[in-house]
């Protein structure tokens, strides 16, 4: 009886070891970079307008440096010009986003505040709107257009 119990315990241990190996393997594979399905890597010319709370023109560069599946990461650097006062400000920060439905681009730009951009991609141009909020509940919003720069 002791031998039968030992044999069952050994078999149970093997099954647990195999199951654990499969689970760990599955987890490891899911975090590996996947082939890009969107092909956004590179430099994009950014133009836009902030319509609230104060009207500003926005110009700069969106650089996509990493893609995995439908996700992407990079950096946005902008020069903002207040249309009333003429004051110029440089802002920049990291971005992360994703593509869905074949042509919808959605990304957050961590500038002075987080600005969520949602736009449609057609060929080498993305156009859309953005909205940002600060801790003091001020809401900023506007439109944007980015065009791929040729290498």
Locations of regions flagged by a protein language model:
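Bacterial N-terminal signal peptides that target proteins for export
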Residues: 2-16
């Amino acid at each position: 009886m002791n031998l039968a119990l030992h044999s069952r315990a050994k078999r149970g241990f093997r099954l647990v070891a195999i199951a654990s190996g499969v689970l760990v393997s599955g987890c490891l594979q899911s975090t590996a970079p996947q082939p890009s399905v969107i092909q956004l890597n590179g430099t994009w010319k950014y133009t836009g307008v902030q319509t609230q709370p104060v009207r500003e023109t926005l110009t700069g560069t969106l650089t996509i440096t990493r893609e995995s599946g439908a996700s992407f990461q990079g950096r946005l650097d902008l020069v903002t010009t207040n249309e009333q006062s003429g004051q110029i400000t440089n802002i920049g920060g990291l971005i992360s986003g994703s593509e869905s439905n074949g042509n919808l681009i959605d990304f957050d730009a961590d500038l002075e505040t987080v600005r969520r951009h949602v736009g449609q991609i057609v060929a080498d141009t993305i156009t859309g709107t953005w909205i940002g909020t600060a801790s003091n509940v001020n809401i900023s919003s506007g439109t944007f257009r980015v065009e791929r720069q040729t290498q």
